[in-house]
Amino acid sequence: MANPDHVSDVLHNLSIDPTTKALAPDSETKLQGAYGGNGNDFLLNDELVEATKIGKPSLLSKDGGVTKDKGSNLKKLGYQSAAYNAKGSYGKGAYAYGYYPPAYQYPRHGYTGSYASGKTNLQYQYLTQQGRSAGNGQSYGGYMDNIYSNYGMCGPYTNGYGYGSYGYDSWKYMPNWYAVNNTYKPRNGYHGYGKENIEGLNEMNRGPRAKGFNSQDGSKVMAVSLKEQRVTETEKLSEDVSLLDPKDYNKIDFPETYTEAKFYVIKSYSEDDIHKSIKYSVWSSTPNGNKKLDASYNEAKQKSDGCPVFLLFSVNTSGQFVGLAEMVGPVDFNKTVEYWQQDKWIGCFPVKWHFVKDIPNSSLRHITLENNENKPVTNSRDTQEVKLEQGIKVIKIFKDHASKTCILDDFEFYENRQKIIQERKSKHLQIKKQTLVANADKGVMSKINLVKPQESTTASEDAAALGVAAEVTKESKVVKETELPVEKNAVATAC
């Protein structure tokens, strides 16, 4: 049995005090003493060691002996179970330091997604002011995206309507994760994964139709950031919004044979931008992509027999193509529209959508591109050119494929998301403007305080001062010219 004087130095999370590490039982003997585990080489620094000693529950009984249920029954070092209550929430007096492997529950989250009852800076305030509710979380160890389920679907429709302690991205809430990787560090106050924009709405690769839900009933489903997780409310669209007619697309008489035509794969970051493209008949690529498409369009227009430029649209990581459009005008490099989800696209060009269908990659994977190392057309980068023969095959598949879903099914869903994004952009710009004005005012006041006050003088006083200075300079010059040289070793007479 270890000395009781040293028992009070036992840490409650990852390791033990370096001064008492020698008293830890060896793993080979399988003996567990007051420290409840075997020797752990993962030691905290002195600062964290001292921090863990503040407010910890005592391991000593009233008579000075070791409490059995607080000593011998402890789990392995770093994974204390005594602080958990029956509901899975984390009790008071325990501190979460260090990195927790995904096989173990992170202490600040309960098994049902609930948070600690005590005050802590890890209790994030959600934009909905509702927080997470116990019982809505996933308790199994699957990987869940911020919005999508394991199949890339929309978050509001996942089983359980929530994300549990073992959910995907839960590791990013661990306090020491950023010491391992800063890739997912909070930006502008938002915790997000990968391509979350500044407004907090993640880029969606597939809408609610992917799980068989139809948003045409007027339900306003907002796929939101980690701070909002889930908000569903019913709201009718404004009267000025007109729905697109599916009859305007996927026409059976669309030509599928061409002597000359150009085809390019377009990879979008989100379906939000696809929705905007169909709605406004416009598209914008990267700077290099715009140059490439503009050159191709100008070259096609010089052909006498006509040469259309077709664009095959797909959303990154969606596993499908969503439509086919035609480039009907050159790129305007000086025009930038403001309704894209991200404000980084410069220039745009008009397009006309011919097909709006969800075509799974499995229906197109057999088409390979010789100009792209014989890779399938589904494995293409943005503005990847598709030769005429392969492009015609793609058109035939778009015509013949009996798709049951398309992005038009989620039109109202994306209309509401667009409204939310625009409102947040407006608020963001307003806050940014107020911040700039406040900083400018602070800068002016700082300069005023730094400048030493000087006595004000009139114009006549300034002129008089300049005149006196001129006279002094003139007299000094005359004196220097009348001075006689002094001989060596001679003594000058005092004036």
From Swiss-Prot:
Keyword tags: Cytoplasm, RNA-binding
Parts of the chain that traverse the membrane: none
GO MF term (any one): mRNA binding
Protein's cellular compartments: Cytoplasm
One Pfam assignment: YTH
One cellular component (GO) term of this entry: cytoplasm
Ranges for domain YTH: 261-398
Function: Specifically recognizes and binds N6-methyladenosine (m6A)-containing RNAs, and regulates mRNA stability. M6A is a modification present at internal sites of mRNAs and some non-coding RNAs and plays a role in mRNA stability and processing. Required for the correct timing of leaf formation and normal leaf morphology. Required for proper trichome branching and morphology. Functions redundantly with ECT2.
Protein name: YTH domain-containing protein ECT3
Organism of derivation: Arabidopsis thaliana (Mouse-ear cress)
